[in-house]
A protein has these predicted regions:
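Catalytic cores and adjacent flexible loops of soluble metabolic enzymes
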Residues: 1-331
């Protein structure tokens, strides 16, 4: 039976798009639920400045609360030098900072300038410095992000050759992994297959690649299947398919440095963790995940957030917000 690793990023990518703060006790409930369901790779938050990402204003406290569980790997986002310094400091303080996602690069320079106010060469130089700092600080695995591989909301379709060039440069710098990202849902399954086939031809170790697709146009699961056929074995998802760019409002207060959202609020998030796990189980893949338990957790997240999310598994099981509205004991 072939193995596929599902990495859950609900607590980071998922929550960063939410416009209301989630208390630590609810985050811990989600974290423990993911672990109990068998999820081994969990992205738990960001070391960004709390002025810009107030959802993670207590990330240091949360990091120290993380339970040490054999086989579970915790990932943190650290996109600039200050955030990297915080990650290293928390590692030194005893927090389980196992893996750090840094070096965020978009093949679209227009996107990079708008999102990060940097040129490509600025970002490559920063990535070079940060991977060195993290490895020297005792972080075992450092992952870079390559985004807008297939297209971006500013420039449109992007040539795949640019992404291969970026991948080469980042591996040469010493990154352990690359997160191949489609933040805009621009990929169709055929282009995803083309890209992943070349990625695996150039760098055939599947442990060095993770795919991160936002399911904006409803093709996320099809793209993940196309990638699996080419040998990709690690995929990022969120419970209920939540997530997206950082919220521009937090509990009624405008967040500093934000502008308009790139997309309408209809669909912004990733492939649903519970849907993907359910599908892989039916296809005969070994994920190590208890799909029923994960679906119950997805329903619990709907109740926490007070709305129905994009999960077919939760809807089919009848365990989510729509059912809880009529069951006071579930809330």
């Amino acid at each position: 039976m072939q193995k596929v690793l599902i990495a859950d990023t609900t607590l980071r990518d998922g929550l960063q798009h939410e416009e209301h703060y989630m208390p630590l006790e609810l985050r811990l409930e989600l974290l423990n639920g993911l672990i109990a369901s068998g999820v081994k790779k969990i992205e738990v938050g960001s070391f960004a400045h709390p002025v810009y990402l107030p959802q993670f204003r207590d990330i240091n406290a949360f990091a120290m609360m993380l339970p040490r569980v054999e086989g579970v790997e915790y990932t943190f986002l650290a996109l600039n030098r200050k955030a990297v310094e915080r990650a290293v400091a928390m590692k030194a303080a005893g927090a389980p900072v196992d893996r750090v996602l840094t070096g965020q690069l978009a093949t679209s320079e227009s996107y990079a300038r708008k999102n990060m106010n940097r040129t490509h060469e600025d970002l490559f130089e920063e990535a070079r410095q940060m991977v060195r700092m993290l490895h020297n600080g005792g972080i075992e695995r450092v992952c870079a992000n390559v985004g807008t591989i297939f297209g971006c909301p500013i420039e449109g379709e992007m040539p795949l050759s640019l992404a291969y060039e970026f991948d080469d440069r980042l591996f040469d710098m010493g990154f352990d992994e690359i997160e191949h990202s489609d933040p805009d849902g621009a990929a169709a399954p055929d282009r995803m297959a083309e890209y992943c086939a070349e990625v695996m031809r150039r760098w055939p170790d599947p442990s060095r690649h993770v795919l991160h697709v936002h399911d904006i146009n409803g093709m996320g699961m099809a793209c993940y299947c196309a990638a699996m056929e080419q040998g990709i074995r690690q995929f990022e998802c969120t419970l209920g398919g939540i997530g997206g760019q950082p919220a521009n409002c937090m509990d009624g207060t405008i967040v500093k440095g934000t502008g308009d959202y790139y997309f309408t609020q209809g669909r912004t998030g990733l492939v649903s963790t519970e849907d993907f796990a359910s599908m892989l189980g039916r296809m005969g893949y070994d994920t190590g995940i208890d799909s029923a338990a994960l679906t119950r957790l997805g329903g619990r997240l709907e109740i926490m957030l007070g709305r129905k999310l994009d999960s077919f598994a939760v809807a089919a099981a009848g365990t989510g917000y729509e059912n809880a509205k009529y069951d006071s004991a579930a809330v």
